[in-house]
Design a protein with these regions (language model features):
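C-terminal catalytic histidine-bearing segment of alpha/beta-hydrolase fold enzymes
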Residues: 43-45, 55-62, 66-107
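The feature captures the conserved acid-bearing segment of alpha/beta-hydrolase catalytic domains
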Residues: 2-64
Length: 107
């Protein structure tokens, strides 16, 4: 849910002053660059009020997962940032709630 899958952009942000990642560390920490071989169901969800870079990372990571798994669900949450996207998982009327329940075999 609204994850950071590519740490390389952090190298060029003020946040990296505290984190102090170098290019190799950023790539090693980035899930998007790992070779994924498990064919398991995945849900990638993000809010449409997220910054464009966060949206791009979610879409790109979902595409990477699609190459490793035929069962990847990309869910875009209207009028939500990452906090509100997390709240959506408990909304029984939301697609995220329904897909999460399905993932865990709850219905």
């Amino acid at each position: 849910i609204s994850g950071i899958y590519d740490f390389e952009p952090i190298l060029y942000c003020s946040e990296n002053k505290g984190i102090r990642l170098d290019k190799l560390e950023a790539k090693a920490a980035s899930t998007i660059y790992r070779q994924l071989t498990l064919n398991i169901p995945n849900i990638i969800a993000f809010g449409l009020n997220e910054p464009p870079e966060m949206q791009r990372q979610s879409i790109d990571f979902a595409n990477v997962l699609c190459t490793a798994s035929n069962n990847t669900e990309l869910i875009k949450i209207n009028n939500a940032d990452h906090f509100e996207t997390v709240d959506t998982i408990t909304d029984e009327n939301s697609r995220l709630f329904a897909q999460t329940c399905k993932l865990f075999g709850l219905f």
